[in-house]
């Protein structure tokens, strides 16, 4: 998938596409030193990483301004959402080397984002509008990890794979949140999982 095709699917400007490219250039440079993503995904980075992450923006609740991205790793989805604009993003990454990479991208691209080099469980409540995560943990474990960040108006947007239905089997036994899944734009087996408190 080409940069222009991804840009069209995400409905972003030429300037945003150029920032995505600058981000991927930094990713490839750092990937030689530290393992940020699977090497096999680099050739398809526009689809596997940029589109996969950026599709979450279409699922923001109204008036979303503040994102908390947990287990940010190489910055997917958090940095992609910061590049797309309209929100500020707090990224949580406990691995120091990955946190340095994230800080470098934020600084060089001038992004509205902040990196927290610590574990999510040790953080004060930041009152985010949306909490995001990709490839971090199962749904029960994720909700346990972010428990101190949740509040009644907070929504969760998680990028999940084919096993998501199994993960949601006993949702009602440990959470009052309501789950909705949407097909992923980036792959046939992936889904966007939305968790919200009932109104």
Protein language model annotation of sequence segments:
Residues 153-164:
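Conserved beta-strand signature within the Rossmann-like core of class I S-adenosyl-L-methionine
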Residues 54-128, 132-133:
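Conserved SAM/SAH cofactor-binding pocket of Class I
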């Amino acid at each position: 998938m080409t940069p222009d095709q991804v840009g069209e699917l995400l409905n972003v400007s030429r300037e945003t596409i150029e920032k995505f490219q600058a981000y991927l250039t930094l990713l490839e440079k750092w990937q030689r030193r530290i393992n940020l993503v699977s090497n096999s995904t680099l050739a398809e980075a526009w689809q596997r990483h940029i589109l996969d992450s950026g599709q979450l923006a279409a699922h923001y609740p109204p008036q979303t301004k503040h994102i908390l991205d947990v287990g940010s790793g190489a910055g997917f989805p958090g940095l992609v959402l910061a590049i797309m604009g309209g929100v500020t993003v707090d990224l949580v990454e406990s691995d120091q080397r990955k946190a340095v990479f994230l800080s470098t991208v934020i600084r060089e691209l001038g992004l509205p984002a902040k990196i927290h080099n610590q574990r999510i469980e040790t953080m004060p409540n930041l009152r985010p509008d949306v909490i995001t995560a990709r490839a971090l943990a199962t749904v029960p474990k994720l909700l346990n990890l972010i428990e101190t960040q949740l509040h009644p108006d907070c929504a969760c947007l998680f990028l999940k794979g084919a096993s998501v239905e199994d993960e949601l089997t006993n949702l009602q036994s440990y959470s009052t949140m309501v789950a909705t899944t949407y097909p992923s734009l980036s792959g046939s087996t992936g889904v966007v999982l939305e968790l919200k408190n009932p109104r």
